Amino acid sequence: MSHREAGQVAAIHFYATAPYPCSYLSGRQARSQVAIPAEAIDGGVYSQLVRLGFRRSGLYTYRPYCDSCQACIPVRLPVDQFRPNRTQRKVWRRGAGMSARWLPLAFDAEHYALYRWYQQTRHAGGGMSDDDAQQYSEFILKSGVDSHLAEFRLDGELKMVSLVDRLVDGLSAVYTFYDPEDSQSSLGVYNVLWQVEQARMLGLSYVYLGYWIADCRKMAYKSGYRPLQMLHGGRWQTMPEG
């Protein structure tokens, strides 16, 4: 760690939020630990925080800090060790006709329309289905680190947008939204495979997938990518099979 990075880390403070209803496990209360101030968290510091289990939502860098629950497990894919299974290989082949490009963080009405459609279809009543353009921008387009949008199209039609952070040692998959009526392309799976390939091309070691939660269907799918590493007891280790 450089003297500059050491100084920045020393300048970071942490506070715990008040309890709030958990978004993933019904009936439970959650808390978060938030790193502040946001302006002190540059790419190097953020990369260190991600390795400690933190994530980003807009300008907020946080990790779970619940009183009586440790269900949220940070996970990452080691790029050089990852081997797609048969289903994932089929998804990759099916997506061969899609074009993808990196874009800067900027408002695009077509992206926002897809985001709204995705939220209202997949997560109706989940708190984000009525996000207006400002709320969308605060969540997707505000960042103090090296962030880009990955845009995916098929025959010119917008199919998916993914918000990705570049870290010192990998890519962090922050948020992805896609055509909710396309049930054939397995767009979410394709996105993970694409990010693995991008990380490999960039010479990066990991793709950070956020939190794995065994009892939450929309988060448990991550264990389908192997070998998957999890942060447990302050150490990254391979998640057992099964």
Curated annotation (Swiss-Prot):
Chief place of localization: cytoplasm
Catalysed conversion reaction: N-terminal L-glutamyl-[protein] + L-leucyl-tRNA(Leu) = N-terminal L-leucyl-L-glutamyl-[protein] + tRNA(Leu) + H(+); N-terminal L-aspartyl-[protein] + L-leucyl-tRNA(Leu) = N-terminal L-leucyl-L-aspartyl-[protein] + tRNA(Leu) + H(+)
Family: Belongs to the R-transferase family. Bpt subfamily.
Protein name as catalogued: Aspartate/glutamate leucyltransferase
Cell location: Cytoplasm
Gene Ontology molecular function: any one: arginyl-tRNA--protein transferase activity
GO biological process: ubiquitin-dependent protein catabolic process via the N-end rule pathway
Keywords: Acyltransferase, Cytoplasm, Transferase
Function: Functions in the N-end rule pathway of protein degradation where it conjugates Leu from its aminoacyl-tRNA to the N-termini of proteins containing an N-terminal aspartate or glutamate.
Enzyme Commission designation: 2.3.2.29
NCBIfam families, per database record: PRK01305.1-1, PRK01305.1-3, PRK01305.2-3
UniProt cross-references to InterPro entries, sorted A to Z: Acyl_CoA_acyltransferase (IPR016181), Asp_Glu_LeuTrfase (IPR017138), N-end_Aminoacyl_Trfase (IPR030700), N-end_Aminoacyl_Trfase_C (IPR007472), N-end_Aminoacyl_Trfase_N (IPR007471)
Pfam family, one: ATE_C
Any one of the GO CC terms: cytoplasm
